[in-house]
Amino acid sequence: NVRLARPEASDDEVRAALDSAHLGAWIDALPRGMATMIGEGSAHVSGGERARIAVARALLADQPVLVLDEPTAHLDADTARRVSDEVLSEERGRSIVWITHGTIGLDAMDTVIRLEG
């Protein structure tokens, strides 16, 4: 599922993206680890796991611009902070657009644009 972002990625690269999204322990607990099929539309995962899978895909794609829409939605505050810290540490010269209703992660941004209405 995560490898869809970059089919030629090695298992180590996929695992690094999963770890950055704080999914490593969850993956390890699955019956077949990274080879476990999780179902169409991610029907067998929680909202938080689904959000972190999307983050892992985005990190694995390794594009120059990373657009994350509510990347920490459905996560508890501690996990949201850890995921945001990890994503922002993976910046590697790319631009990150972080769309959020919350404030977690905004303190690390170079520029914050607030829309009200």
Predicted regions and their residues:
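ABC ATPase nucleotide-binding domain helical subdomain, centered on the C-loop/LSGGQ "ABC signature"
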Residues: 1-40, 84-85, 93
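Conserved catalytic segment of ABC-fold P-loop ATPases
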Residues: 107-114
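Helical segment within the ABC ATPase nucleotide-binding domain
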Residues: 80-92, 104
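A short, proline-enriched helix->beta-strand linker immediately N-terminal to the Walker B motif
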Residues: 60-64
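Catalytic Walker B motif of ABC-type/P-loop ATPase nucleotide-binding domains
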Residues: 66-70
